[in-house]
Amino acid sequence: MTASRVLVLNSGSSSVKYQLLDMRDSSRLAVGLVERIGEQLSRLKHTPLAAGGESREWTGPIADHDAALKAVAAELAKDGLGLDSPELAAIGHRVVHGGKHFTEPTVVDGAVLAEIERLIPVAPLHNPANLTGIRTAQALRPDLPQVAVFDTAFHTTMPESAARYAIDVETADRHRIRRYGFHGTSHAYVSRATAKLLGKAPQDVNVIVLHLGNGASASAVRGGRCVDTSMGLTPLEGLVMGTRSGDMDPAVIFHLARVGDMSIAEIDTLLNKKSGLIGLCGDNDMREIRRRIDEGDERAQLAFDIYIHRLKKYIGAYYAVLGRVDAIAFTAGVGENAAPVREAAMAGLDQLGLAVDAELNAVRGDEPRLISPAGARVAVAVVPTDEELEIATQTYALVGSTDMRPRREGND
């Protein structure tokens, strides 16, 4: 296949993030963001990287995703990278929820679109926007393969003992209630990159991946396959996050409805947008929380302590699930940049072979690196995630194969 470029689109409800990559060397040719779609002051920022060009910004009304992608196409064309280029092999789309139906990236057809739409009830904030992005791209280049890469796909290897909730089986099956997990594209990339850092093949490494951003999740990866993950039916379960509560007693919801006279919508907003770090101390930026701690702020300290306590519980649980752990990998905004979080998460875990070297932990960088002491039984690493490269890699691998039929398994 002579065409070697892949355009990666991450379509949100009011934004489109994009990158154009050349898969011959995985280099980025252009990156950009369209935000506040549907508003009078929409904003597009485009940076051509191939020619070392300067960023261009534009502000004005962008009515919908169709207008947004047309604006992106126009910016790319200015740099000789237009969507009509014969060098463009495919467009890869991030799709948040594929249920257990999609276990691999798949070329989009009518049946695939219908299945993504069928999953909207379990991903109401994300799948509609992802669908809009795909359909808009199809309209712009109907002859070009559109590939869906699912956040949930990496987690479909979990055993039923990890994926099932302990509720009535018929009810769970009827409403597709199970642990799906999210951030899978990041967990897949980081687990492989960690194995490479250790000089081993992915199938020979057991790793606990900690994706710590405003949204946060952990996964237990045995030999390159996910066996457990912290997020569940939705991204609300698991770790303490920027604005999400993570794990809690489900009866809190009933209590708030009965005693607090709150509606389901109000409780949903509380747990997803007004909880986690921001609910505990009013901030969801770890840098600001650390600054407040340094000034003696007790609420910030408590929020940090709760965050770390939950993180340690998952590290211990996944250590038990895996049996043997070769590495702990920190990734995403907080995981990559917040040395105090990494230090606190590993503190007191010497009996598990876990520790960080203070000097190595303080070093900042863009490359995967070890922060554990020399000779440590378990490697502790900082591994910057690259979800766009992972989507492009999976997309290119699929369209470069001879079999481009949609890849699905069974029905939910």
List PLM regions with ranges.
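Short glycine-rich, Thr/Ser-proximal phosphate-binding strand/loop in the N-terminal lobe
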Residues: 6, 15-62, 232
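Phosphate/pyrophosphate-binding loops at sites that engage ATP/ADP/AMP, CoA/4′-phosphopantetheine
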Residues: 75-89, 194-201, 315-326
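Short beta-strand-loop/turn "lid" adjacent to the catalytic site in phosphate-handling enzymes
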Residues: 76-126, 145-147, 153-164
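Glycine-rich phosphate-binding loop of actin/hexokinase-like ATP-binding domains
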Residues: 154-259
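Catalytic phosphate/nucleotide-handling subdomain of diverse soluble enzymes
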Residues: 221-263, 269, 332-363, 369, ...
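A mobile "lid/hinge" subdomain adjacent to the ATP/sugar-phosphate binding pocket shared
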Residues: 259-303
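Internal helix-turn-beta structural module
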Residues: 301, 305-326, 335-409
